[in-house]
């Protein structure tokens, strides 16, 4: 089993648990160049989203595949979720290690008001 397959298996297992519990979750996806975040309901409806592909976020940071960009995305998605009245979520890291950009996004979202 290669690295990507193992990550996808971990993600599927944890995602199934979140859906069974009926929790709203903050889903992240990380590529070498960008990072994406979405607040998704248990039914699969996207309530808020942010990514380094967006022009507003891309222009505020130097580079899109670094910790500073992840912090900007975390803050933006938390503010957009707060506008919709969402405060408590589960953090779905999609099988990625809780380190580096993933941790930076989570910490920024917590500082901006999301609870998880």
Swiss-Prot record:
GO CC, one annotated term: cytosolic large ribosomal subunit
CDD domains, sorted: Ribosomal_L18_L5e
Presence of keyword Ribonucleoprotein: yes
SUPFAM superfamilies xrefs: Translational machinery components
Domain of life: Bacteria
Keyword entries, A-Z: Ribonucleoprotein, Ribosomal protein, RNA-binding, rRNA-binding
Pfam families in UniProt: Ribosomal_L18p
Keyword Ribonucleoprotein part of the UniProt annotation: yes
GO molecular function terms noted in the UniProt entry: 5S rRNA binding; structural constituent of ribosome
GO biological process: translation
Quaternary assembly: Part of the 50S ribosomal subunit; part of the 5S rRNA/L5/L18/L25 subcomplex. Contacts the 5S and 23S rRNAs.
Entry's family note: Belongs to the universal ribosomal protein uL18 family.
Stated role: This is one of the proteins that bind and probably mediate the attachment of the 5S RNA into the large ribosomal subunit, where it forms part of the central protuberance.
Name the UniProt record assigns to this protein: Large ribosomal subunit protein uL18
Species of origin: Pseudoalteromonas translucida (strain TAC 125)
Name of the coding gene: rplR
């Amino acid at each position: 089993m290669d690295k990507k397959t193992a990550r996808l298996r971990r993600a599927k297992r944890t995602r199934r648990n979140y859906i069974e519990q009926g929790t709203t979750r903050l889903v992240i996806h990380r590529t070498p160049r960008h990072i994406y975040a979405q607040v998704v309901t248990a039914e699969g409806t996207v309530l808020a989203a942010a990514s380094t592909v967006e022009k507003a976020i891309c222009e505020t940071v130097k580079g899109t595949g670094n910790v500073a960009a992840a912090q900007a995305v975390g803050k933006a998605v938390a503010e957009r979720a707060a506008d919709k009245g969402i405060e408590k979520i589960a953090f779905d890291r999609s099988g990625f290690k809780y380190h580096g950009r993933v941790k930076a996004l989570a910490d920024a979202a917590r500082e901006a008001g999301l609870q998880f």
